[in-house]
């Protein structure tokens, strides 16, 4: 809930300073520091063309949808039709602000991120493929993974490796 309130506060501030009626916002997690210029550009272009952009990554492992309250599997979705939602998640400012205001007025508490909220309120969501290294850094293991990614990129720059 705190994250959503923080996003909403940021959206209200963005609305106050927006100069265009059609302003684009990219909502990004501070715990994803490995974002790159291409992801940002792809998000902006997708919003211009389709009205939204949800950065995703292809699923590499089997996803299990379980029956709530039990240790049983309800179904196994195809990897071909499954993606992991990441950030940034990007929209027209007015659209995402309206969705937040509707969620607040309804007392909605189940939307875990911006794309979940936008889908709940009937907006079409368009996906862009993001890089695998756009990971969340929330555990020591994530930190070491990030460090390895940065070292690999540094070696590419120093030694011209691809």
Which residues does each PLM region occupy?
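Conserved small/polar residues in nucleotide/adenosyl-binding loops
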Residues: 1-2
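Active-site nucleotide-sugar/metal-binding loop of Leloir-type enzymes
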Residues: 5-24
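Conserved strand-to-helix beginnings and helix N-cap segments that scaffold or border functional pockets
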Residues: 7-8, 37-40, 140
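Residue-level signal for inorganic ion chemistry
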Residues: 10, 29, 58, 92, ...
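Short, well-ordered alpha-helices that flank and scaffold nucleotide-derived cofactor binding pockets
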Residues: 12, 16, 45, 120, ...
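Conserved core of the sugar-phosphate nucleotidyltransferase
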Residues: 21, 34-128, 162
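Short glycine-rich anion-binding loops that position phosphate/pyrophosphate groups of nucleotides
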Residues: 30-33, 133
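Hydrophobic helical membrane-anchoring modules
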Residues: 134-162
């Amino acid at each position: 809930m705190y994250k959503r309130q923080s996003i909403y506060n940021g959206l209200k501030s963005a609305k106050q300073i927006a100069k265009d009626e059609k302003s684009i916002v990219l909502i990004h997690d501070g715990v994803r520091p490995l974002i790159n210029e291409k992801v940002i550009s792809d998000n902006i272009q997708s919003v211009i063309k389709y009205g939204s952009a949800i950065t995703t990554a292809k699923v590499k492992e089997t996803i299990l949808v379980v029956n709530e309250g039990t240790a049983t599997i309800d179904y196994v979705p195809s990897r071909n039709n499954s993606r992991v939602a990441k950030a940034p998640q990007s929209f027209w400012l007015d659209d995402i602000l309206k969705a937040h205001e509707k969620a607040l007025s309804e007392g909605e508490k189940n939307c875990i991120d911006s794309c979940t909220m936008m889908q709940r309120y009937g907006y079409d969501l368009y996906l862009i493929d993001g890089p695998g290294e756009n990971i969340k850094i929330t555990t020591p293991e994530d930190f070491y993974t990030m460090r390895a990614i940065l070292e690999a990129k540094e070696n590419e720059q120093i030694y011209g490796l691809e």
